[in-house]
């Protein structure tokens, strides 16, 4: 199984890339993380947030791996603990489907994409920069894996 992070946004600062890379390189080969950046739509010329999100949805759908479990990150999603994520990972691995975590653009994710998600997940109750979400998600995926392996990284 492969873990994909599809993120609307590009040209992240170096510290974001370094933080993200730090956790992705720690993952085992059977749970590799692949980042797919989606170029954000411009909000110029009076375009509505709805039209921007719809255009970004099309780009996201084109980048989604076929048959992947869709986990959409949204501020109104379910609030999982790290332990809940760790409990989900083995089941996801057993069913063999790749998992795609989707981080929307500045306006969020298109409602149609959120409606078809297998899981709608909130990563924090706080508002975070999109680049930081990449790092936090990669860290939580590594932490969840470490829990399943009784690795000493997670000590809580």
UniProtKB/Swiss-Prot annotation:
Its EC number is 2.1.1.177. It catalyses: pseudouridine(1915) in 23S rRNA + S-adenosyl-L-methionine = N(3)-methylpseudouridine(1915) in 23S rRNA + S-adenosyl-L-homocysteine + H(+). CDD domains: RlmH-like. GO terms for cellular component: cytoplasm. Belongs to the RNA methyltransferase RlmH family. Homodimer. This is Ribosomal RNA large subunit methyltransferase H. The lineage of its organism: Bacteria, Pseudomonadati, Pseudomonadota, Betaproteobacteria, Burkholderiales.
């Amino acid at each position: 199984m492969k873990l994909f992070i599809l993120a609307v946004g590009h040209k992240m600062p170096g510290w974001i890339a370094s933080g993200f890379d730090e956790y992705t390189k720690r993952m085992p080969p059977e749970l590799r993380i692949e980042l797919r950046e989606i170029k954000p739509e411009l909000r110029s010329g009076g375009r509505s947030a709805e039209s921007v999100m719809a255009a970004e949805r099309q780009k996201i759908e084109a980048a989604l791996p076929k048959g992947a479990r869709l986990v959409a990150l949204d501020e109104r999603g379910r609030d999982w603990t790290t332990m809940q994520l760790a409990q989900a990972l083995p089941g996801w691995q057993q069913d063999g489907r790749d998992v795609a975590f989707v981080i929307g653009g500045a306006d969020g994710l298109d409602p149609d994409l959120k409606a078809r998600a297998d899981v709608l997940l909130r990563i924090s109750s706080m508002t975070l920069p999109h680049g930081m979400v990449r790092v936090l998600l990669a860290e939580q995926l590594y932490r969840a894996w470490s829990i399943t392996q009784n690795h000493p990284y997670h000590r809580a």
